[in-house]
Structure formats: structure tokens, C-alpha cells
């Protein structure tokens, strides 16, 4: 009795609920629009086709297996299947595509490799051929009619999607397309086999090939679920392609609202691919790789941001990392000061040498010319793509001041080693340094978040949020210093204040020679961590005021970094993995659980 409703209650609804619970922290309005749009399209496209199948006895349902109500002869349970299948597959697609930065996969739109052209054309030819064969097979009531009806209905839609987004789909990682297609398909095959075995629905004799993939699962039913999931995944990917165009190219879409409009999506579809700035895509690829190699915590958290905010955060990190590397890789203090002077001049060209009458294109060319002459080629993209039109100047200049403080250190074993200087004399110097190198980054991140998510935020709220972000940045830097005492000593740096050392009867030289040694160093490490967690405790509640789209990922990034501090505080064998000869590390499972907890709590 009511077997079809039982199938939903036992299989499809629980799967949808579970996927919703898993995906909930990362779902945003765009995902809901994507999924809702595809549900409407799937329902509308399947309605007349399904009605035709039932009318011509291809599909049938025992009266006792359904509740009763119908639309165009289709049981309500079947109508619900259109919706629930689309929803399930869309959620699986969203989950597997969240780590993917789709903008990186627009690079094959202008000059695709030969293999991609061949695959796309081959796919088009095959889909046309299957459509024609399906049309012929569906004309007569014979064993191939059900398979023909599936193909003549689905293949034209697949052809349209493949023509519009084939190159983009081929550019995506296999796990972002193949798994969302096949995982729901395998699950629904099992559900369908169960229903066919129970007689919940049946395929009319004489309309099928009578070949089963396994058990009672007819090859036609297996084909149906495969091609419909291909349609759903293809539709989601096509949607993501046009979103990626909007987010990736500010020259084509200078201002993107919180959520792109339908008009913008249509524009992105109609824009000629020759206008795509592929140099920007390559620069973004460099930035992502720099992020992946240099910061596991932020790399993980960044994938949870969305849209142009995610891209701008990556570009900001790339600039900060590049500037830091220029300082760290320098061979002398003089070289460090040379780099900081060049970085300051780069900022001057953007912020201080602004001439309202100067043509923006000429200004950009002038800045690019300076970048190419003053910096190595590997630095070009990080500097060129920095979104200075959004970022406030003061935190950027202060960031360079932090590098200037670093320049006062000499490098162990170099010709400068006879003139040791340690700029962090007391608590105030320590705080200033942390503000310069980390508090500024917090302020810059908040500036990007406000610009992209809540540009109408009041000035008072902005200042309060920026202050909290700065304090949180200081806390994270204290954790960083506590973690890297040994690593920093190897390059001749001691960030512990001189006043702390004197109180404990230590000198900088003693720390450099034996950074893992006396217990007093461990006491100072704990003092740094106490200061860090005190600042963290004061700033953490303020982070709840971050706009909802960015709150979870931002808090997740902070919590992942503070987990390092917790590792250092625990120091219990078997509880965590700590390498004091280098850097404390947080196990991957713990990093992931910390991030998920932060997301679910929002």
C-alpha cells in the first residue's frame, strides 16, 4: 500500500535531508537560485514527456502503490521525483565544486587545445545521432520505443548544454563533474531496482529491450537516470561558467552586486570570449598556487568564500605573501630596505600620485611599467592584480612598515652579523609589529568583505569591525611568533621583547644559539599565547557582525589558526602532533573539524 510514497520516505527524502545538513554551512543564495531554476526547468521539461509515457502505457503504476492524486495522469509521487532527484544531484554538485575556483577554468574559452575541440565536436555529433535514432525508435511501438523516447527527449537538451558549456565542463577537475553525475546515478539505480522488484512501477511489455543492468533494473531505466543526472550537472556547470565570467573580469563587470542579476548572467553569455582577460586568469592561477603552498589554513578556508570576494582575498594574500618573500629572501638589510622602498613607491603610484585628470589607462600603463622595471618577473601578477581601488591605503603602508622592522634584523652568517639590531624592545614594539604585519591584513580583509557584501554598512560599524579585525590579527601574529621561535632563530631573528629576555636573564644571542633550550623560553612562549588568547577572546564576539556570506569562512580561518595556539598550549603527548624543532602542526582531521564546527555554529 502506497509503495511509491514509501520509496520516497525511505530513500529519496533521507538522502536529500542528509545532503542538506552536510551542505548547509556552504549554501548561499546563488546556490538556491541555481537549484531552484533547474528544478523548475526539469519539472517543466519532464511533465509533458512523462504524461506521454503514461498515456501510451510505457510506464504504469498499480493503483494500490500510489496515494491517488495525479496531474496530466502523472501521480504526485512521480512529480515529486522530478524535484527530489534534481535537488539531490544539485547538492552533490555543489559539494564537490565548492573547492573549485571556476574562474581558473575559463582559460580554454579562446584557444582551446586540439583534443578539447575534437571531444566537443565528437560529443555534438554523437548527441545529434542519438537524437535522430531516438526519434526513429520512438515512432513505432516496439522494443526500442522507451529507449528512443528517453534519447529523443534528453539528447537535444544535452546538445544545447554541451554546445554552450562543453569546453568549460572539460576544463573542470574530473571530480567536479564525473562524481556528481555518477554518485546520484548509482544511488538512484539501487532505488529504482528496489521499486521495480516490489512492483511499485513497471515498464510496459513490448516497449523495452528486456535487458537488465543488474537485478530488475532495465537498461532503459539505467539510461534514464544517467542522462537526467548528466543534464542536471551540465546545467549547473553552465550556470557556473557564466557566474565565473562575471566574477573573474572586473573590466567587463566593474560592479557586481551581492548576487548577480539575470541581466548580468545574460550579458556574460553574450560577451565574446575574445574579450576575456586571460592574463588575469594566469595571474589568479599564480596567486592560488602561492596560497596553496604557503598557507594551508587560509587555503582551506578560502574555498568557502564565494564570488569576487574570494578572488580579491586570494589576490590580497598573494600580494602580502610576495612582499614578505621579497624581504625574507633578501641577502642583506640593505636589500630589504630597497624592496620596502620599491613597495612604498608602488603604493604611492596608486594612492599619492593620483591625478584626477589622468587617463586611467595611461595611469595603469605607468604603474605596470614601474612594476616591470623595479621587480622580478615573478612579482608582476601579484602587484598588477592587487585590488587597490577597494583597499584602503593606510593598512598597506603599515604592512610595509612591518617589513621595515624586519629589515632591522640581520641575517645569521652574513656580513651584517657584526651589527645586530633587535627592534622589538618591549611590549609596545611587539604590539606595533603585530599590528603592522597582521592587524593590517585583518583590516584589509574586512575592507574587501564590506565592499563586496555590505557596502552600505555605517561608518561607525565599519570602524568597530576594522578595530576588532586588527586585534584578531595581532592575536594570530602572537600565535605565529610563539610557534616560530625556533624557525626565526635560524635566520637570526628574535621577536621576543628585549625586556622579557632581560627579566629572565637571557640575551638575544642565547636565544639564537639555543632556541629550544631553557625553560624560560617556554615560559615566554606561554606568555605570548596568553596575550593572544586574551585578544582573541575580546575580538571574537565582534566577528559575529561580519556579513553572513563571509562570517563562517572568516571565523573558520581564524579558528584554524588559533588551533595552532591550542596545540602549543596542550603539549600533551598523544593529544596532538607537535614538532618544536620546527613548527607546530595541527593534524588535518583536527583542522577540518575546527573549520566545520565554526561553519555550523554560524
UniProtKB/Swiss-Prot annotation:
Q: Which InterPro entries does the entry link to?
A: Isoprenoid_synthase_dom_sf (IPR008949), Lycopene_cyclase_dom (IPR017825), Squ/phyt_synthse (IPR002060), Squalene/phytoene_synthase_CS (IPR019845), Trans_IPPS_bact-type (IPR044843), Trans_IPPS_HH (IPR033904)
Q: Where are the transmembrane segments?
A: 6-26, 30-50, 76-96, 118-138, 146-166, 168-188, 230-250
Q: Give the consequence of mutating residue 208 to E.
A: In JA28; Abolishes lycopene cyclase activity and accumulates a polar precursor carotenoid of neurosporaxanthin
Q: Where in the cell is it found?
A: Membrane
Positions of disulphide bridges: none
Main localization of the protein? membrane
The name on file for this protein is Bifunctional lycopene cyclase/phytoene synthase
List the source organism.
Neurospora crassa (strain ATCC 24698 / 74-OR23-1A / CBS 708.71 / DSM 1257 / FGSC 987)
Which classification does the entry list for the species? Eukaryota, Fungi, Dikarya, Ascomycota, Pezizomycotina
Gene name, per UniProt, is: al-2
Amino acid at each position: 500500500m502506497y509503495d511509491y510514497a514509501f520509496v520516497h520516505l525511505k530513500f529519496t527524502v533521507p538522502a536529500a535531508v542528509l545532503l542538506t545538513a552536510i551542505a548547509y554551512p556552504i549554501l548561499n543564495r546563488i546556490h538556491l537560485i541555481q537549484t531552484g531554476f533547474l528544478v523548475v526547468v526539469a519539472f517543466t521539461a519532464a511533465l509533458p514527456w512523462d504524461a506521454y509515457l503514461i498515456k501510451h502505457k510505457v510506464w504504469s503504476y498499480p493503483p494500490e502503490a500510489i496515494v491517488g492524486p495525479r496531474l496530466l495522469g502523472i501521480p504526485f509521487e512521480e512529480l515529486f521525483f522530478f524535484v527530489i532527484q534534481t535537488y539531490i544531484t544539485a547538492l552533490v554538485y555543489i559539494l564537490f565544486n565548492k573547492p573549485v575556483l571556476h574562474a581558473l577554468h575559463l582559460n580554454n574559452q579562446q584557444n582551446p587545445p586540439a583534443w578539447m575541440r575534437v571531444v566537443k565536436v565528437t560529443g555534438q555529433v554523437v548527441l545529434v545521432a542519438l537524437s535522430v535514432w531516438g526519434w526513429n525508435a520512438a515512432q513505432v511501438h516496439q522494443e526500442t520505443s522507451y529507449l528512443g523516447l528517453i534519447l529523443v527527449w534528453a539528447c537535444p537538451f544535452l546538445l544545447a548544454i554541451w554546445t554552450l558549456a562543453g569546453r568549460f565542463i572539460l576544463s573542470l577537475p574530473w571530480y567536479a563533474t564525473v562524481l556528481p553525475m555518477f554518485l546520484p546515478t548509482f544511488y538512484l539505480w539501487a532505488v529504482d531496482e528496489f521499486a521495480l522488484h516490489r512492483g511499485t512501477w513497471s515498464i510496459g511489455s513490448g516497449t523495452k529491450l528486456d535487458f537488465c543492468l543488474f537485478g530488475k533494473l532495465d537498461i532503459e531505466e539505467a539510461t534514464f537516470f544517467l542522462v537526467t543526472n548528466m543534464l542536471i550537472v551540465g546545467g549547473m556547470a553552465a550556470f557556473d561558467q557564466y557566474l565565473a565570467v562575471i566574477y573573474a573580469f572586473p573590466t567587463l563587470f566593474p560592479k557586481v552586486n551581492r548576487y548577480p542579476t539575470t541581466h548580468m548572467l545574460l550579458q556574460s553569455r553574450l560577451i565574446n570570449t575574445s574579450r576575456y582577460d586571460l592574463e588575469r586568469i594566469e595571474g589568479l592561477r599564480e596567486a592560488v598556487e602561492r596560497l596553496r603552498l604557503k598557507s594551508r589554513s587560509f587555503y582551506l578556508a578560502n574555498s568557502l568564500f564565494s564570488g569576487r570576494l574570494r578572488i580579491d582575498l586570494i589576490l590580497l594574500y598573494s600580494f602580502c605573501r610576495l612582499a614578505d618573500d621579497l624581504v625574507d629572501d633578501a641577502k642583506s638589510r640593505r636589500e630589504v630596505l630597497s624592496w620596502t622602498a620599491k613597495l612604498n613607491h608602488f603604493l604611492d603610484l596608486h594612492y599619492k600620485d593620483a591625478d584626477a585628470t589622468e587617463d586611467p589607462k595611461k595611469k595603469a600603463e605607468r604603474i605596470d611599467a614601474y612594476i616591470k622595471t623595479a621587480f622580478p618577473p615573478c612579482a608582476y601578477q601579484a602587484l598588477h592584480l592587487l585590488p587597490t581601488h577597494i583597499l584602503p591605503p593606510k593598512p598597506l603602508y603599515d604592512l610595509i612598515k612591518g617589513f621595515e622592522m624586519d629589515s632591522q634584523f640581520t641575517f645569521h652568517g652574513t656580513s651584517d652579523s657584526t651589527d645586530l639590531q633587535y627592534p622589538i624592545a618591549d611590549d609596545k614594539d611587539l604590539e606595533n609589529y603585530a599590528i603592522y604585519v597582521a592587524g593590517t591584513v585583518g583590516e584589509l580583509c574586512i575592507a574587501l568583505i564590506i565592499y563586496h557584501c555590505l557596502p552600505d554598512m555605517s561608518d561607525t560599524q565599519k570602524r568597530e569591525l576594522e578595530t576588532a579585525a586588527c586585534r584578531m590579527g595581532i592575536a594570530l601574529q602572537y600565535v605565529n611568533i610563539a610557534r616560530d621561535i625556533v624557525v626565526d632563530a635560524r635566520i637570526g631573528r628574535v621577536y621576543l621583547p628585549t625586556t622579557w629576555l632581560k627579566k629572565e636573564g637571557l640575551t638575544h644571542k642565547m636565544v639564537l644559539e639555543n632556541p629550544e633550550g631553557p625553560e624560560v623560553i617556554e615560559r615566554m612562549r606561554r606568555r605570548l599565547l596568553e596575550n593572544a588568547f586574551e585578544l582573541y577572546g575580546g575580538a571574537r564576539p565582534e566577528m559575529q557582525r561580519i556579513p553572513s556570506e563571509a562570517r563562517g569562512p572568516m571565523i573558520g580561518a581564524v579558528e584554524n589558526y588559533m588551533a595552532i595556539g591550542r596545540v602549543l598550549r596542550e603539549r600533551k603527548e598523544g593529544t596532538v602532533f607537535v614538532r618544536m624543532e620546527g613548527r607546530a602542526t595541527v593534524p588535518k582531521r583536527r583542522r577540518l573539524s575546527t573549520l566545520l564546527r565554526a561553519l555550523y555554529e554560524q
